[in-house]
């Protein structure tokens, strides 16, 4: 599995430079499977905005940009520590036609966008240190970003989890899951944790099916839970 994981990292890395071309190409040329689009439209029809969520799975950049071709999209991004790499990736994302919102200062813009019925794409599967909420991932408590669930609860926007994985013929398979509807208040830690656990469960399900596609090099369980949660 490790060998296949590194092979997949190389293939996706090679496709990064082609991101704008892939996004603007006819869908059937890029995607062998495009499944669950009705879930995106159903979520948007609720009029509360949509949080499109994925993990570091397959070509997650292509997932966000392709959804941006389907409906107006902003991507909440964390700037890279390397300025040169950050500028290169930002240029690729801009050429793909999506709006970029930086994490931190961009949160207010994200809330405004969702409350206006807009769409937001983000990642939610890396170690969030002490700022995260602890939910189980492969049976172990993992510090998980609270942002997706918090935004959903604060605005009423459903979460639509999706993935963009390599197909056997070299193209990609995009799949969207039914919307996760927010239940509770953004100020309720229990509600944030419960919704985070729900979308993390979807991620785990996909990773179990396609383990080579997830970014295993990240130290997902780096932050230990506090004693009262362990």
What are these regions (language model features)?
Residues 37-41, 64-65, 89-90, 110-111, ...:
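Short amphipathic alpha-helical segments and helix-helix/interface helices
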Residues 18-21, 33-36, 59-64, 82, ...:
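Generic structural "secondary-structure junction" signal
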Residues 1-3, 44-46, 69-70, 104-230:
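Non-catalytic C-terminal accessory region of glycerolipid acyltransferases
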Residues 12, 30-31, 53-54, 79-80, ...:
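A short linear-motif detector with a strong N-terminal bias
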Residues 46-105, 127-136, 140:
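Catalytic core of membrane glycerolipid acyltransferases/transacylases, capturing the structured
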Residues 7-10, 29-31, 54-60, 75-78, ...:
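Short, functional N-terminal and low-complexity linear motifs
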Residues 1-54, 86-87, 91, 97:
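Membrane-anchoring hydrophobic helices of lipid-metabolizing enzymes
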Residues 35, 76, 175-177:
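Residues in well-ordered beta-strands of folded domains
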């Amino acid at each position: 599995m490790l060998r296949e994981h590194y092979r997949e990292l190389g293939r996706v890395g090679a496709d990064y430079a082609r991101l704008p071309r892939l996004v603007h190409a006819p869908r059937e040329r890029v995607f062998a499977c495009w499944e669950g689009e009705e879930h995106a439209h159903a979520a948007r029809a609720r009029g509360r905005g949509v949080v499109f969520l994925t993990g570091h799975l397959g070509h997650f950049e292509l997932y966000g940009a392709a959804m941006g071709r389907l409906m107006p999209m902003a991507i909440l991004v964390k700037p890279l520590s390397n300025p040169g790499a950050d500028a290169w990736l930002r240029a690729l994302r801009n050429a793909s036609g999506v709006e970029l919102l930086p994490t931190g200062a961009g949160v207010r813009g994200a809330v405004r966008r969702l409350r206006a019925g807009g769409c937001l794409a983000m990642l939610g599967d890396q170690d969030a240190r002490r700022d995260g909420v602890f939910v189980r991932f492969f049976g172990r408590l993992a510090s998980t970003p609270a942002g997706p669930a918090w935004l959903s609860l604060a605005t009423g926007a459903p979460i639509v989890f999706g993935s963009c994985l390599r197909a056997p013929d070299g193209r990609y398979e995009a799949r969207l899951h039914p919307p996760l509807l927010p239940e509770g208040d953004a100020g309720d830690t229990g509600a944030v944790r419960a919704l985070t656990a729900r979308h993390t469960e979807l991620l785990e399900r996909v990773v179990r099916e396609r383990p080579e596609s997830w970014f295993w090099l990240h130290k997902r369980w780096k932050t230990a839970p506090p004693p009262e949660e362990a």
